[in-house]
Amino acid sequence: MELEDIVNEEMPTTEDVNDMLEHTDKGRTKQTIRNCVTVLQKDPVLKKAIKRNELSGRMDIVKEVPWERRNNSSTVTDTDENNLKMYLEENYELTSERVIKAGVDIVSNENKYHPIRDYLESLVWDGIPRIENMLPHFLGAEKSKYTIGVMKMHMLAAISRIYEPGIKYDIMLCLVGSQGAGKSTFFKYLAIKEEWFSDNLDHLDDENIYRKLQNHWIIEMGEMKATITAKNIEQIKSFLSRQKETYKVPYEVHPEDRPRQCVFCGTSNDLNFLPLDRTGNRRFAPVMTDMSKAEVHILDNEAESKAYIEQAWAEAMVLYRQGNVFLGFTKEIEEEAKRLQKEFMPEDTNAGIIQEFLDDYDDDYVCTRILFDEALHRTGEMKQWEGKEIANIMNNAIVGWKPHGTHRFGKEYGIQRSWKRMKDSVKKDKDGFIEVPEQLEIPFE
């Protein structure tokens, strides 16, 4: 077979495609989904032109079409739909909107693609390690097992969310430091393309939150606004732990589960940016930046910065393909994560007041009512939320006491749930000195 014959066979004309369609006895094109699918699969202009974007969930036009498009975006617009209908009407007598809609849905799904997956698979690593140096290089962060570990974890999580949408990952990488260090730019460049990045997440209870996640890979919470405006810490935990959103996009009939394909990042100039959580802020991975120690500012040479980050993604892809991907704090870095999580929380004044009270407290049993009255010096009836707050402090922030069950506290307080002083806890006498047991060995002569 000659080359010209092969080309002609692969690229049929509109007349050839018309001959493939089912017609009525009068020679008119039947308004069937099968006919529409055939046209979309075989027409020289429309073949592989419309694909379903697995990142956005929308349909994209990915090749040149015989009408003027409204903007530079690949996403199908109303104007595209109207031009497609006119093209099908003029060339194939297909006019049924129901048929055209169904045909486009079927064929675009057959031709689905993932732009980020395609990008990642196109990368070739040059063999030079960069992930371990990214945070020190651009942001002056300390190079340590912790900073290397959280950067690698976050990049592998971002890749995992593309290949395994909805995979469990509930940690937010947070960059802390002075304004102008390039923290937000770092995350924007990390997303590779501007359309894969978003910093438009200000409220976690936004009813249209899915629209702000859709089509984005790296999502920054600038100045941690979304966590600041959250109703409570549980709302933040729930949001970060969620693996999917369930919603119905416009023009679709049925709602669908949309597994998350994004990871979340935070930036802040405030050193006390984390919410007060006495159970621990394990969902946050804070990294302190220092612009004065950075090897380069990320904006000094945009092309070089982007090339560096692209090679870091190529390196991360090599690690991902090797397997053994762990999307959490390893034992090696967990202690440092806990220390930093506490360091970036606001001071817990009530916990400090209660701890000081208990250090001088005579009894070995205590309850929330005693702490409410005598430690915090509050008056009136203790509200339910106040009792919960005190219990939370006792269970998570106080040293030397443990939950005990019920205990009788006399006429004033009656039987209450209690905490008991632990045996190895020390108690001060009335003058503020620690009692030393007789058998304790004095460490000097």
Where are these regions (language model features)?
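N-terminal nucleic-acid engagement/recognition segments and initiation subdomains in replication
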Residues: 1-130, 145, 149, 380-385, ...
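A short helix-turn-beta junction within AAA+ P-loop NTPase domains corresponding to the substrate/partner-engaging
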Residues: 276-295
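Conserved catalytic/switch belt of AAA+ P-loop NTPases
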Residues: 233-256
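Short glycine-/polar-rich loops that comprise or flank the Walker A/P-loop
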Residues: 215-217, 243, 260-263, 279-285
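AAA+/SF3 P-loop NTPase mechanochemical coupling elements
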Residues: 209-214, 249-267
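DNA transaction DNA-binding modules
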Residues: 327-445
